[in-house]
Each structure stands twice: as C-alpha cells, then as structure tokens.
Amino acid sequence: MVKDMPNKFSEVTPEIEELAKKCNKKIDEELFAKYDVKRGLRKRNGEGVLAGLTDISMINAYTMIDRKIVPCEGKLYYRGIDIEDIVKGFIEEDRFGFEETAYLLLFGELPNKDALKQFEGMLGEYRQLPTNFVRDIIMKAPSRDMMNTLARSVLTLFSYDDNASDISLPNVLRQCIQLIALFPVLSVYAYQAYNHYERGESLFIHLPDPELSTAENILHLLRPDSKYTKLEAKLLDMALVLHAEHGGGNNSTFTTHVVSSSGTDTYSAIAAALCSLKGPKHGGANIKVVQMFDDLKANVKDWSNEEEIREYLLKLLNKEAFDKAGLIYGMGHAVYSLSDPRSKILSRFVKQLSEEKGKEEEYQLYATVERLAKQVIGEKRKIYKGVSANIDFYSGFIYSMLGLPHQLYTPLFAIARIVGWSAHRMEELMNGNRIIRPAYKAVAPHREYTPIDER
C-alpha cells in the first residue's frame, strides 16, 4: 500500500464515529441487581457460579469454620495431587517436570519411567511441522501480535489433517498431543518472523530437537546460539508446569468447554481458547507487571527506601501513576485469598536465577513491593478476602531475566495451558451431552415498526 494513503482496514472514518454513537447504549445498572444477574458468572462475594464438574484440577482458597467461609493458604491440585508435591518430586530427582505434568493432566495418573519416555518420544516426533508450513503460513504473513499468528497457525493445521473434524476420543487425543508438541515451535517461529520482517533483525530458524524437553526446546529455538544454562531451562520448565492448568472456570478453559460443547473440531476449539487468552484481562497480566516495575524503577530513585516505594504504590491505587488504572499488577486473584501456591513456589527459585543473572537488587525490589503492596491495599481498599501476590507477579520477572521478548509472554502461557485446554476438551466431549447455553433476560421495551417514509 502506498505510504500516507488511508488504509480502509484500519481507519475509523467520521461516518463510523457517528454510527458508533448509536451503539453506545448501556443497560441500566439497576436491572442487573433487579434480576440478580451473576455478572462475570460470579456471585457478589466473587465466588464463581457452579457451571460444571471436573476431576482435572482443584483450587482451594477457603475453609469452613463454624459454618463460616474463612480464607486460607491457597492450594492447587492436579488430578488430586498437590502441586507442591509434583514440583518437589521432579526437583529432587533433578528432572524436567512439564512432560510428566502433561501426562498426568491428560491421562489422570503419573507415568512410570517407560510411559514417560514413550510420551516424551511422541512429543519429540510430533514437533515437526508439515512441509513448507513455516515458509507458506508463518513467514509470508508475519503479525505484530504473536497470539494472532498462533491462532491462525492452529486453524491452518486443520487443512493438513485428513481427519480434522473427527471428534472421537482417540483422534482428539492425537490432535491435542500434536498441538502440545507444536505450540513452542509455532510461537517461537512467529516471533522470529516478526523480528525479521517487522523489525529488520537477523532471521534465525533452528529445527526443534526431539531429545530436548519443552523448556529446553523453547530456549534452543529462540536464541541465536541455542545456548542456555541448566538453571534457565529448569526455571522455565517450572513456569510451564505452574501455568499448565487452573480449573474449568478461567476464561480460556471455559471457552474451550463452551466451544467444544457445540461439537466443533479441535483446531477451532483451541483457536477460540487462544483468542480468549489473548485478552489483557486474562493472559497479558505478567507483561503489565514488568511494565509497572519499569515505571516504578524510573520514578523511585532509591530502591532500598521503603517509604518511597510505598508512596509509589499509593499513587498506583489512587490512579496517579503508571497506566492510572488503580491497580497494583500481580497482586490479588479472583480465587485465591491468603496466597497463590504457584507464586509461592516460583518465589523460592527466582532468587537463584537473579543471583546467576546479577539481578539480586531487582529481586529484592520485587520482594519489597510484594510485602508492602499487601499492607497498602489492605489500608486503602475494603477486602473481603486476603490479598497476595499471584503467579504473574514473578513470572514476568523470570521471563525478563531469561531474555524472553515481551511478545512471547502470553504465547508462553498458551504453550503451558494447551495441556489444560486439551484435558478439558476431552472431559467435555466425554461428559457433556448438551450444548452450553446460559439464559439472557431481554429488557428492551416493545415498539411498533415504523414505515421508512415516516421515520
């Protein structure tokens, strides 16, 4: 397209501006209360409306004392096993844990050595993309948004699958395992295409190594020299494990259930989940944390001065700093109260990486903000449950220390969560025999039709 010429696919014309005013009609807030609408499918206390059953994972953030709900330390279980024990197991045995976790979530049981080796071999074999896919699909139409490229690639894979629309359990499982294997490749290649064609950087396309773990392959594919340390790979692996699954009610997983209930194919269901995860209210929070800390570092002169940090946090809550949204990003969670177990696990190991990278001072800043933010929020806001750091608080810091570009933060979430989506898709197909269709109350008044000459 000629420079300075208007782009009809991008330009909002004055005519569109005028028409948009006709769309800007909000429903009276009082009607939501009148009809007891569970907005966001949540009750007034923040608890989600019960929409289904699952045995894939369980989140525990409350306990009952004297018939009263009392906040407690958060717990997360994958197929009934405490996430703390899962992490402890592969850390103590000096193994990578993502592949084992994927097996557990998909099949409901921990693999023995032979089963794990077979599953890892399957993932390695499936990491190869169809012939010319990279050239024809990824390189020819690079996007500034990696999630859009990833969703497009997933939908395009439908065309390469002779049984794409078959939703029998064995075929869906095969498709899901292939997508789990391919997500790291599709994500990194999408970034490499963007980095080359949009930013003019050198193009590096490494082939995936079937002998490497998922975390190792990500670093191998992304870095020009393919080099990484063991600690780097282990921390990335842990982040993938902790992002792999989080119940059926989070937006992208619920999207998977809703779309799967229609009987559609796997590629369409997973693409829909990706589009949900792309939303900044869901998958983009760790980027916001890093950007918030960048702003904090630019405005707080002395990182060891707690009073100066506290003043900045107050400005965040008062909508006077950063994006003026009134939020301290990385603090608080829709479900967890006193603690997010995933954040607690990450925080124990992030210090090691900060020492390897010479980022101890920055780590201490994160730890100070985590401690002070709880106090500041407690003083300024009415809290019905505890507030604590969530997984986004430290994951973005880990990714930045690994030198991962911001454009890949949300795709990394997807690389992990495709496991949970896959398990929930199969669970929906096995147990849900009705299309998900909640009710909406119509509140528009009845009107008479007016002939066009009388309007």
Residue ranges and their predicted role:
Residues 2-455:
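Non-transmembrane, aqueous-exposed alpha-helical and coiled segments at domain scale
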